[in-house]
């Protein structure tokens, strides 16, 4: 059933990794800025020592990015083991300025083998069309000038990459096992980050939907040739027309030209996942998150699978039916699972990502 459904979507065939990365930068997310930044870290503060019987500390540092146009500092929080060993790391770009929040179950995370790095995305630059906040004026001192200049997703992704520069200097980091994780718009950001930076061995997308891990062609937000929708209101998936009208500043200006047709003639979102191969990708889709179009997210994983198969690897685990809440496909290098939740980075999701990473951890 799924393979036939995928054929019905009439997706463009995968291209070379270099071509797919170029297309997605030029037409959707924009080109990342030149890395002419210096990084500095200061004022380490221990916030809590009691986690895991004192073996895990929660601390913060002031993280500064500086170039010829100025500097910007934002707090980075670290949940780090103190046992002297090497640990896999999950870098989570977060929605909340408070480190203990609904997206970050800190007590549970502290009891795992993972070191966790987190920070608030709006501390990097604001989530709006203002390109004079945070690192934006350091990248665009005269504002965005070109239709291919990156939007806010690109700036958040660039900051993720600079935080990784720092994380790789920490003694406890296992450099082969570092993941980037984000939810919703930050799930799109995590995927773009992972595509652009091969140092991330794992890329985790949570409910990223339209312009993230959901293919656009034939999605539930689009009518068929007779004007009928596959899913009736209010359960229709988001479209490029909607997202570029409401959140145009997330993307480069070029992306707006696809609003009416809802996809590029020579690309769709399976390119975003495929360009990460041969590294590991895990996509969570939520049972009640119709806006993210769960079926199109699972089909995107299936469409991208060929990129791994061409390299002699297993892409997505074989399945011919859509997932139900609580089900998962974790045997392949593309993992996909469905949490029995709404649009949310839940404990179920965190547990799923950590399980997938344990299965595929690099030695």
Identify the function of each model-found stretch:
Residues 1-73, 361:
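N-terminal targeting or regulatory segments adjacent to alpha/beta-hydrolase or S9 domains
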Residues 68-74, 80-90, 112:
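Proline/glycine-enriched tight loop/beta-turn segments at coil->beta junctions
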Residues 85-162, 166-169, 209-218:
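Cap/lid segment of the alpha/beta-hydrolase catalytic domain
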Residues 173-184:
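Alpha/beta-hydrolase fold nucleophile elbow
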Residues 182-194:
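Glycine-rich nucleophile elbow surrounding the catalytic serine of serine-hydrolase chemistry
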Residues 205-272, 297-319:
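Mobile cap/lid helix-loop segments that gate and shape the active-site cleft of serine hydrolases
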Residues 246, 295, 302-363:
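C-terminal catalytic histidine-bearing segment of alpha/beta-hydrolase fold enzymes
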Residues 277-294, 339-341:
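Conserved strand-to-loop "acid loop" that flanks and positions the catalytic carboxylate
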């Amino acid at each position: 059933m799924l393979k036939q459904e995928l054929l019905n979507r009439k997706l463009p065939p995968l291209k070379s990794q270099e071509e797919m990365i170029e297309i997605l930068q030029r037409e959707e997310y924009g080109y990342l800025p030149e890395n002419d930044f210096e990084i500095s870290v200061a004022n380490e503060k221990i916030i809590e020592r009691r986690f895991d019987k004192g073996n895990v500390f929660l601390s913060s540092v002031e993280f500064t990015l500086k170039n010829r146009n100025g500097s910007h500092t934002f707090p980075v929080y670290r949940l780090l083991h103190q046992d002297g060993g090497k640990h896999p790391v999950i870098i989570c770009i977060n929605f909340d300025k408070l480190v203990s929040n609904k997206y970050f179950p800190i007590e549970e995370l502290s009891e795992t083998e993972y070191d966790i790095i987190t920070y608030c995305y709006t501390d990097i630059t604001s989530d709006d069309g203002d390109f004079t906040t945070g690192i934006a004026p350091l990248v665009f001192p005269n504002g965005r000038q070109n239709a291919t200049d990156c939007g806010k997703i690109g700036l958040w992704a660039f900051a993720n990459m600079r935080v990784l520069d720092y994380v790789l200097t920490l003694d406890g980091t296992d450099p082969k096992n570092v993941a980037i994780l984000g939810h919703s718009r930050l799930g799109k950001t995590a995927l773009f980050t992972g595509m652009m930076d091969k140092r991330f061995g794992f890329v985790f997308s949570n409910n990223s939907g339209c312009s993230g891990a959901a293919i656009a062609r034939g999605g539930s937000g689009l009518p068929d040739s007779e004007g009928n929708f596959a899913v009736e209101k209010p359960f229709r998936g988001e479209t490029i027309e909607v997202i570029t009208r409401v959140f145009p500043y997330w993307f480069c200006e070029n992306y707006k030209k696809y609003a009416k047709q809802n996809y590029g003639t020579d690309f769709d979102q399976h390119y975003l996942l495929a360009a990460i191969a041969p590294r590991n990708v895990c996509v969570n889709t939520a049972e009640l998150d119709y806006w993210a179009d769960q079926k199109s997210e699972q089909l995107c994983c299936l469409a991208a699978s060929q990129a791994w198969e061409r390299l002699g690897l297993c892409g997505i685990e074989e399945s011919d039916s859509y997932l139900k809440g609580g089900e998962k496909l974790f045997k392949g290098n593309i993992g996909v699972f469905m949490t029995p939740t709404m649009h949310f980075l839940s404990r179920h999701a965190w547990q799923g990502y950590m399980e997938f990473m344990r299965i595929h951890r690099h030695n």
